[in-house]
Amino acid sequence: MKIYKLKSTFGWEGDDGLGEQLIQQILAGEKSATCAPKSLYSKDELRDVYQTAGQLVTVYDKHDNPRCNIKVTDVFETTFGAPDMRLVKGEGNGDRIEEFQEDHRMAWAELIKSGELELNEDTVLITELFVLVKD
């Protein structure tokens, strides 16, 4: 597998296997989008994520093992309360917005509980759309 300069990590210590599940969904062609609250990005991180549009990126697991490559096709903002349907579908939720929202409430539960994240209808999400690259 070719390793690209740009890197995207799925998973974190204590994620109860979520990162691995997301990587498996990418590999199976079931996941073609990801998102994170804009408030969790630094200015430099925001600049960097927007520059990934059109770029090839290597996906790593939480143990820093390269797992696959993706091509980022678009990066944009949407809100948690009215998410762009490309995000909802790309996350594997079809047209089920409420399911998408509940999945992300659970994924970000620790951040919400610790006060690091306030999640509401107006929370801005940075969205990355991508396709799996076989190389």
Curated annotation (Swiss-Prot):
Transmembrane feature ranges: none
- Ranges for domain ASCH come to 18-130
The family database entries (Pfam families) matched by this protein are listed as: ASCH
In Swiss-Prot or TrEMBL terms, this protein is called: Uncharacterized protein YhfF
- What's the source species' lineage? Bacteria, Bacillati, Bacillota, Bacilli, Bacillales
